[in-house]
């Protein structure tokens, strides 16, 4: 059997601005993100460090889009798995325009990394027992969340937790 090809993109980067969320006529959510990935290197001749940042357009569909709109904020680090897709349209002057986007839908993955701006803005500050959205992994529209964040809300503990910050539920 002949292979038809592979179209898979994996990115780890930082959100450039808060997600823009729209809803389609059928009620499905669509979130548009800009994601920055950077690489640094040292120039041999003078030892100077250089950096190049690449900006990616990411379009997230369904439940993933709703989660992105609730938890992702400018500066947040995120892991994205999706597919490349190029769209064509005609602008007002009749010129054909193209844009290439990373599409994240049912087969894609979005995982929020780190702590930076991972709490929704409308929630008040809570004790650091469970960082909202941190480490939340979502694969496709079928799983809303994985890990302890998927459980029902719990009452905050009477005493503050120790200062260490790790998750014993990590499967590796």
UniProtKB/Swiss-Prot annotation:
Top-level division of the source organism's lineage: Bacteria
NCBIfam families recorded: ssb
Matching Pfam families: SSB
Protein name according to UniProt: Single-stranded DNA-binding protein 2
Residues annotated to bind DNA: 55-61
Record note on quaternary structure: Homotetramer.
Gene Ontology MF: a single term: enzyme activator activity
Biased composition (Low complexity): 119-153
Purpose of the protein: Plays an important role in DNA replication, recombination and repair. Binds to ssDNA and to an array of partner proteins to recruit them to their sites of action during DNA metabolism.
GO CC terms, sorted: nucleoid
Domain SSB as annotated: residue spans: 6-111
A single BP term in Gene Ontology: DNA recombination
Region (Disordered): 113-172
Keyword terms of this UniProt record: DNA damage, DNA recombination, DNA repair, DNA replication, DNA-binding, Plasmid
Short sequence motif named Important for interaction with partner proteins, residue ranges: 167-172
Disulfide-linked positions: none
Endpoints of the signal sequence: none
